[in-house]
Amino acid sequence: MRITKGKMKHNFKKWILGAAVIAGCAGMMGCSFTKDNTKSGDLNTDAGKRHDNLEYNGSVVDEDTLEKLASLETIIDQSYYFDTSDENMQNGLYAGLIEALDDPYAKYYTPEEFAKLQEDSSGEYAGIGVVVRQDEDTGYAIAVSITEDSPASEADIKPDDLICKIDDYEIQESDDLDYLVTKIRGEEGTDVTLEIYRPSERKYHTVTLTRRKLENSTVSYHMADTDKKIGYVRVTQFVANTGDLFRKAVEDLKSQGMTALMIDLRSNPGGMLSTVVDMCDYLLPAGKIVYQEDKNGNVLSTYESTNEEQLDLPMVVLVNGESASASEIMTAALKEYGVATIVGENTYGKGIVQSVIPLSDGSAIKLTTAKYFTPNGNDIHKKGVAPDIEVELPEDYVSDDFQGEKDTQYQKGLEVLRGNVK
């Protein structure tokens, strides 16, 4: 894989996380992003680049602003009924500056939050084992996928379940997904009680789970058709170890005689850019995978495949309206190179880049810094990637139908690959 970089300005300039893994479960994080503020995703992490000593030439923090802040602090000290702390007030100032951008993907991380964000991207956590996104209307955390043999799976939490309450805290529409993930995660061996609404039953459930250390297994696989030797690999998000897990899965299927491959990216909110680029390098011929441009149209980075080990098999990629960000990068590249047939629904349409910029006190900010473009130069932001074969799930589909007869997208993928295998 080759990466070429254009000229970049050193200014305050990603997961999907987009999805969040609460497996520790951390978040669709590194970060990736889904439509509903899901964490996890397309993070460009400018780790090691410190921006604290930049010469200030702005106009926001002027003398009048400082004087007004001092007046506000004095009024709060004298008149506010409840207790607060200097640290809370200061963090509120920093967060408020970022929130004023009115960008759902921009965020200020306290040192504690940033440390958890970095942990979330590593692939091992202490938590309950569920990947979540956030509903933009209610603020509720929606289960996207459940880790096998985890507290969440043992408690029978299912995809599409809505987490409405965490211990005694009722989730608000204004809550940030990072904040919710922090409340669900905790020390190994401690309990968390969740109130869950299951749409398929129209019922609320209350479950208590004990957090434990879990490896965030973002990849699962099996031989979907043992006669035709059609392999199936599901990728729920892109964290640091996903690329290695994906290669191992494919190599294992190849050792079993695999003749065609179905990659399931449905409801994958995204994740780390470096991970999806590495996976595309394994699947594509030599050439461009994705490139980024800043707001002035300058090319910041171009990511290319070296074609050192292209997987030469018929492929299908399954996607839906919750496939976002890094998932769309992979989908678009495989489609435009003609190496895979895309089956399902139009993807979400998140084609912007967030960068996480660490500060010297251990805190960090996440800002939208660029836009992605596909190998053919297409802008997918707010448009998504259209499938080659559009297939919707039936109205009576529920999560228990996954990979079954009612999973019409999965069945169509098998049909396409069976037609390509002799």
What are these regions (language model features)?
Residues 76, 147, 395:
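Short, histidine-centered active-site or binding-site loop motifs used for metal coordination
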Residues 354-358, 365-397:
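Conserved P-loop NTPase
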Residues 2, 144, 153-155, 159, ...:
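Cleft-lining beta-strand/loop regions that shape enzyme active-site pockets
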Residues 229, 313, 392-399:
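Flexible glycine/proline-enriched surface loops and loop-helix/loop-strand junctions
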Residues 126-128, 139, 205, 229-231, ...:
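A generic secondary-structure signal marking the coil-to-beta-strand transition
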Residues 123-169:
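Glycine-rich active-site/cofactor-binding loop and its immediate structural neighborhood
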Residues 2-134, 165-166, 171-225, 237, ...:
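Intrinsically disordered, Ser/Thr/Pro/Gly-rich linkers and terminal tails that flank
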